[in-house]
Amino acid sequence: MAVECDRVVEVPTIFAAGDTANAATDDLGHRALMSCQHANRLGASAGFNAAADLLGVPLEPYRQKNYVTCLDLGPSDAVFTRGWDSKVEMSGDKAKAMKREINTQWIYPPRANRPDAFKASEWARLVDY
């Protein structure tokens, strides 16, 4: 579903993130694909905007400066691309190590307690690859 400021265009009382959101990332026509790789950033933005909407303050548009893909290709191989045109930066063992780090450290859910959950949602924690 298309989103603007993480708000579902067709149903403005709903905010979307991650696999459910096809979000504009800039004013150049780039969009975050409907993928779990954007869930942390989109989730933080959607949470902020849902709270802003409840408080009646302006929403912040979702922004994503860059786009990366790290695709697992089996037991010992992967490929890492950067940019909206997906230029290959790494492949093989080095990309596989990056993929393991992403899967085990970057996108791992926070521990089930309030302080860690709120810390995980901080804008400053989000990475512009």
Residue ranges and their predicted role:
Residues 22, 47, 78:
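Short, electropositive, low-hydrophobicity segments enriched in small/polar residues
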Residues 1-40:
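FAD-site-proximal beta/loop scaffold in flavoenzymes
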